[in-house]
Amino acid sequence: MKAIFITLEGPDGSGKTTVGTLLNQKMTEAGIDFIKTREPGGSPISEKVRNIVLGIGNEEMDPKTEVLLIAGARRQHVVETIRPALAAGKSVLCDRFMDSSLAYQGAGRDMNMEQVLQVNLYAIEDTLPDRTYYLDVPAEVGLARIAANKGREVNRLDKEDITYHEKVQAGYEKVINMFPERFMRVDATKTPEEITETILADILRQLA
């Protein structure tokens, strides 16, 4: 069985974390040799950067600082976690990757998406996902889910208003148009179990 790099993307409240947990279980049951990781984070240094970027109290952070910090964390994650796993024949399941930077920082912060893309391509070099699952849900539905989930850890980006989250969604649409061959859009208004089964079936096809 070949090793592939899989990423989960979607706006806040799309159910990505829940689906990631279920997918981890189902992929293990299917006998797939893989690791599960996340961004920002995924390595000791990158997790420290995550705490800075998402920490409540860092609202004054400049948008370009945000881009550069996340790109730096991503570089370390690629070098320390993702590439070694792929080289060892293990697939990688990652909660967010470069596309999040394009949507959240590029579009959400009204930055030049091409510049954000180039910064990230410099960081990751040739380590692009083989398959990206975009969990598609309206911004208002996602934010309502966040508000209803009292046990969810709230980060700095969750506190942004609906306009920001709508920009993020529009940004994702641009990213999907940039890389249509690796994206699969998944209806995230369905149950986590239904979403997981849809994604797992496609992963098994990709690995065949």
Swiss-Prot record:
Q: Give me the reactions it catalyses.
A: dTMP + ATP = dTDP + ADP
Q: Which UniProt keywords apply?
A: ATP-binding, Kinase, Nucleotide biosynthesis, Nucleotide-binding, Transferase
Gene Ontology biological process terms, A to Z: dTDP biosynthetic process; dTTP biosynthetic process; dUDP biosynthetic process
Kindly indicate whether the keyword Transferase belongs to this entry.
yes
Give Gene Ontology CC terms: cytoplasm; cytosol
In Pfam terms, one family for this protein is Thymidylate_kin
Residues holding ATP: G10, P11, D12, G13, S14, G15, K16, T17
Q: Which PANTHER family match?
A: THYMIDYLATE KINASE, UMP-CMP KINASE 2, MITOCHONDRIAL
The UniProt function text for this chain reads: Phosphorylation of dTMP to form dTDP in both de novo and salvage pathways of dTTP synthesis.
The name on file for this protein is Thymidylate kinase
Species name: Listeria monocytogenes serovar 1/2a (strain ATCC BAA-679 / EGD-e)
Q: What is the lineage of its organism?
A: Bacteria, Bacillati, Bacillota, Bacilli, Bacillales
